[in-house]
Amino acid sequence: MRTLKIVAPLLIAFSILLYIYVESTSPTASLPDVDLPHSEQSTEAAEMPLVSPLATIAETLTVNSPLASPPPPTVTHTITYDSAAVAADSTLTETAASRQTPIWRYEIIRTYPHDPTAFTQGLIWLDNIFYEGTGLRGRSSLRQVDRDTGDVLKQIDLPAQYFGEGITILGDKLYQLTWQSHTGFIYNKDTFTKLADFPYPTEGWGITHNGQQLIMSDGSSTLYIWDPDTLEELGQIQVTDQGQPVMRLNELEYIHGQIYANVWQTDHIAVIDPESGNVTAWLDLTGILAPADRTGQEDVLNGIAYNAENDTLYITGKLWPKLFEIRTVVPQ
């Protein structure tokens, strides 16, 4: 019994010492809970991005934000009027601005009555009266019209098979085109006595002159130069805007060395350099015929005449109830 009392404490002490020894030499010894240096982190942990998912999303949103992105490249649009579609008015404004083709506005000086049954195809201001050529088969005519009242002073009707088109006066002769009949007429400008017929191979749309030659359109981007006596073709003008063809050239007027051309189915007039064929400006007549003046019977803008005394233009359209005297407003 005495021996047991002595050995038992020794065994307990030995056990404690053995436990301490084992714990102090064990490879799995417990260490304080501290972070390891970055150089000792696992390879997998070192390769993982040290960015939280939310931070990644935030970065992505920032990169894709329009405010953080560089400005988009400038896109240049070009107006091309072709047989399939015609650019809208707003498109003209946007694209002409991007191409640096000047856009002219207008100021209405006076408003005059216009025969709403006149399908205007050509318009001339001479000796204080209008000469007007009208279209539609069975309704085509050549007229003298009083500006202030809109009354018809003189009129001859074309044979029913002809669809009348543009007119011009050079000297004492008045020239009138027809649309698809490949036939034009020459009249005495005062009496409307027909002097001759003449053929041409294309459609007839608009006609004007530069004082020496006739200039004619056929609805394409080409203008034709004719000898006024023989009606032979002397040359062509290819009309382009920033290198692109301008189609549907219609009624023409020659003003200050430039050709003004209605572009069919638009409210715009192309101002054309006859030497190069380049469009030097666009006259935007959007809204010139107010909604209150529209009855639903009106057709497109067509008809340009020049008043040299006032340096103003007369503008109307097919079946329009009004005719406008305007002054162009060129942006500074």
Place the predicted regions along the sequence by residue.
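Conserved beta-strand positions in repeat-built beta-propeller and related beta-rich domains
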Residues: 130-137, 174-181, 216-220, 261-265, ...
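Signature of short aromatic-glycine-proline-rich micro-motifs recurring in repeat-based ectodomains
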Residues: 120, 249, 296-305
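Short coil/turn segments that connect the beta-strands within blades of beta-propeller domains
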Residues: 127-128, 171-172, 211-212, 256-257, ...
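Intrinsically disordered, low-complexity Ser/Thr/Pro-rich tracts
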Residues: 1-6, 13-106, 332
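A short helix->beta-strand "capping" segment at the edge of beta-propeller domains
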Residues: 96-116, 147-151
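Short loop/turn segments that connect beta-strands within beta-propeller blades
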Residues: 146-150, 188-192, 228-231, 273-277, ...
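Surface loop/turn motifs at the tips and blade-to-blade linkers of beta-strand repeat domains
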Residues: 111-116, 156-160, 196-202, 238-244, ...
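Beta-strand-rich domains and repeat architectures in extracellular enzymes and scaffolds
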Residues: 109-141, 156-168, 319
